[in-house]
Amino acid sequence: MFVKVGDKVRVISGKDKGKEGTIKQTLAKKNRVVVEGLNMIKKHQKPNNANPQGGILDVEAPMDVSNVMLIDPSTNEPTRVGFKTVDGKKVRVSKKSGESIDK
C-alpha cells in the first residue's frame, strides 16, 4: 500500500472529494484507509458501561485507498507514488517532484 498512518492525503472521488486529512488507520487486507474527519457515518450505539447514555455517534468509515491521493510534503500538491531502492531499502518517491517521501 502506498500510504502509511500519519500521511496527509486528498480525497479524489466520493462525497468528500477535494477535502484533505491524515491517515488514521490502514486496512491492507481490504485495501481501505480511515482518514481523520472524513467519510463520517452515523452509528447507533446501545447504552453500555462505557457509554451509559447511548445514542447516535459520528464515526469515520473506511474508504477505498484508490479514492485518496498522497500529498507531496515538499510541494503540498497531490502526487502519484513510486518506489525506489536506496541503500538496500525500499523508499517511496513522489512522481511529480521526484523527491523521497520517506525521510
UniProtKB/Swiss-Prot annotation:
Pfam families: KOW (PF00467), ribosomal_L24 (PF17136). GO terms for molecular function: rRNA binding; structural constituent of ribosome. The keyword rRNA-binding applies. One of its GO terms (biological process) is translation. Signal peptide: none annotated. GO terms for cellular component: ribonucleoprotein complex; ribosome. It comes from the Bacteria. The keyword Oxidoreductase does not apply. PROSITE patterns: RIBOSOMAL_L24 (PS01108). Keywords: Ribonucleoprotein, Ribosomal protein, RNA-binding, rRNA-binding. Part of the 50S ribosomal subunit. Belongs to the universal ribosomal protein uL24 family. One of two assembly initiator proteins, it binds directly to the 5'-end of the 23S rRNA, where it nucleates assembly of the 50S subunit. One of the proteins that surrounds the polypeptide exit tunnel on the outside of the subunit. HAMAP family: Ribosomal_uL24_B (MF_01326_B). This is Large ribosomal subunit protein uL24. It comes from Pediococcus pentosaceus (strain ATCC 25745 / CCUG 21536 / LMG 10740 / 183-1w). The lineage of its organism: Bacteria, Bacillati, Bacillota, Bacilli, Lactobacillales.
